[in-house]
Amino acid sequence: MRHKRSAKRTKRASATQLYKTCKQAGTCPPDIIPKVEGKTIAEQILQYGSMGVFFGGLGIGTGSGTGGRTGYIPLGTRPPTATDTLAPVRPPLTVDPVGPSDPSIVSLVEETSFIDAGAPTSVPSIPPDVSGFSITTSTDTTPAILDINNTVTTVTTHNNPTFTDPSVLQPPTPAETGGHFTLSSSTISTHNYEEIPMDTFIVSTNPNTVTSSTPIPGSRPVARLGLYSRTTQQVKVVDPAFVTTPTKLITYDNPAYEGIDVDNTLYFSSNDNSINIAPDPDFLDIVALHRPALTSRRTGIRYSRIGNKQTLRTRSGKSIGAKVHYYYDLSTIDPAEEIELQTITPSTYTTTSHAASPTSINNGLYDIYADDFITDTSTTPVPSVPSTSLSGYIPANTTIPFGGAYNIPLVSGPDIPINITDQAPSLIPIVPGSPQYTIIADAGDFYLHPSYYMLRKRRKRLPYFFSDVSLAA
């Protein structure tokens, strides 16, 4: 049974093609014009609804169908990227056409043009020919030879002082860095104007301040020892052997350590299988004791050493231990003692013009003496005659203070009166009269400092020296 062959279905034209032909004729189906012009019900809902709702430029409800600012990207494709590389703009190249008569070999060496500097050459003037132009045709292939005469050029140079090189100073001659020497520099002038004498710089040195000719690099600051960091343990050593023989504090007497230099780093071997006991427990597990350092502290001079301990050792051979700062104070600076100063009695005094009475001076003088020296030891009556003459020998004691702790200036003192009562003579001498006697004090005068007048009477504890003198008549 033969199958009936179906008729081929004719494809309908697209809405855009139908819109182009039927719009003018007015025969478009009712669904073509709204679809092409975007006036369908769905698009009108989006168009009027987007007036009250803003979707951030995503292209929703705009009715344009463009996909927003970025547009629609087909699935499975990548957006186009700019692959153009930027390069500097080069000037255009001019290509000269090659004629049939040009040589086939092009020389790559460019011709060098020479420009002669100097005075311009004179160009001779040719008078015009009145008869007209003469044309000469020649088939000779010999190159033309032009005779050019050498031109003599004269160049005159004027020196401008503004652009003239300055004076060149010769470098100083090398000298040894020792002894007294003097460096001086001479001047070479290359100008032709007036010369002005210049001062010569003289550098004189002595052996105490000689500097080397080698340039000195930039000086680096002194590195800090790091003795008082947070990771360093501080241990104070009291034993003075830490300064002279520090090995006695770490190991017992070993002949191998005799005669070593204590100013260098000391290394000590450690045995993992045994326990090393140090004489001083502060130096337990020490494997290295570095060089000493003297530092100045507020309390005095300090002798310091850095020690490394080996408390733990891993299988790989790495040692783990603390870093210890051992220090020994060599001296201490005690605070300054405060000495109370006493006021010294001034040695200057004021002298008044009026003389003091003997009684007032004697009262102040005898106040500072002992009671035993104030009264007279003895009084002997002297026979006298009615003629008011006094005779006799009167022994007496008096005290004169000599120099003590202070320098006492000498001033004139009062006369010492001797009170003797007149007695009636029991016997009348045969001699009608006797000569008068004069009392001479066998001692020198002394001066009492005015500052002692106001002192109260003191008994004992006298800082003066006393001596006895006798009065002879």
UniProtKB/Swiss-Prot annotation:
Instruction: Provide one Gene Ontology biological process annotation.
Output: microtubule-dependent intracellular transport of viral material towards nucleus
Give a yes or no for keyword Thylakoid in this entry: no
- Where is the motif named Nuclear localization signal mapped on this chain? 1-13, 454-462
Q: Name one GO molecular function term.
A: structural molecule activity
List cellular component terms (GO).
Answer: host cell; host cell endosome; host cell Golgi apparatus; host cell nucleus; viral capsid
- Name the source's superkingdom: Viruses
Disulphide linkage map: C22-C28
**What function is annotated for this protein?**
Minor protein of the capsid that localizes along the inner surface of the virion, within the central cavities beneath the L1 pentamers. Plays a role in capsid stabilization through interaction with the major capsid protein L1. Once the virion enters the host cell, L2 escorts the genomic DNA into the nucleus by promoting escape from the endosomal compartments and traffic through the host Golgi network.
Spell out the note in the miscellaneous section.
Answer: HPV16, in comparison to HPV types 6 and 11, is more often associated with malignant genital cancers in humans.
- The family this protein is said to belong to: Belongs to the papillomaviridae L2 protein family.
How is this protein organized at the quaternary level? Answer: Interacts with major capsid protein L1. Interacts with E2; this interaction inhibits E2 transcriptional activity but not the DNA replication function E2. Interacts with host GADD45GIP1. Interacts with host HSPA8; this interaction is required for L2 nuclear translocation. Interacts with host importins KPNB2 and KPNB3. Forms a complex with importin alpha2-beta1 heterodimers via interaction with the importin alpha2 adapter. Interacts with host DYNLT1; this interaction is essential for virus intracellular transport during entry.
Q: What is this protein called?
A: Minor capsid protein L2
Q: What is the lineage of its organism?
A: Viruses, Monodnaviria, Shotokuvirae, Cossaviricota, Papovaviricetes
Supply the gene name.
L2
